[in-house]
C-alpha cells in the first residue's frame, strides 16, 4: 500500500487531485476556509464514489454530526482524539473493500438499482439487454455478499453511495 498525502484549498484543486491520484480514503479538516467538508464530500461522491470520507473536526454539534453521516461521511474524528484515526480509516476501508472489486458497469447498475430503477429502465438507460443488467446485478450481489435488493440498498446507504434519510 502506498501512502500519499496532499493538501488542497479549492474545489478545483480537490477535483484535480481526486482524478490524478485516485485516493483510497479522504480526510477533510473542517477548518478549511475555501472548501468546506460537505462541498468536498459532494465532489468526492461525483468523482470517486467508493472512496471513504472522514471528517476531522473540533467540536461538532449534534446536527453537524447527523448531517455529515447522512451526506455519506464514514466518520467524524475529534482533533482531541486523533488516536482513533488509524482504526477509523481501517474500518472504513474494510467496509468498502468489496465495493472496489466492482467493475465500472457493475457500479453503474448498483447505483441505478438502489435509486429505484426497474431492470428494464436500467437496460434502456445503459443501452444493454435486460439479461445483461440481471447478470451485472447478480455479480454485484455476489461480490457484496447480499441476497436481495433490500440488503443491497442497506449496503449502499452504509457505504455512502446514497444518503440515509433515517
Task: List PLM regions with ranges.
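The short loop immediately C-terminal to the conserved phospho-acceptor aspartate in CheY-like receiver
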Residues: 30-31
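The C-terminal output helix
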Residues: 90-102, 163
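C-terminal output helix
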Residues: 61-67, 77-89, 125
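Short amphipathic alpha-helix used as the core "switch/output" element in two-component signaling
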Residues: 38-50
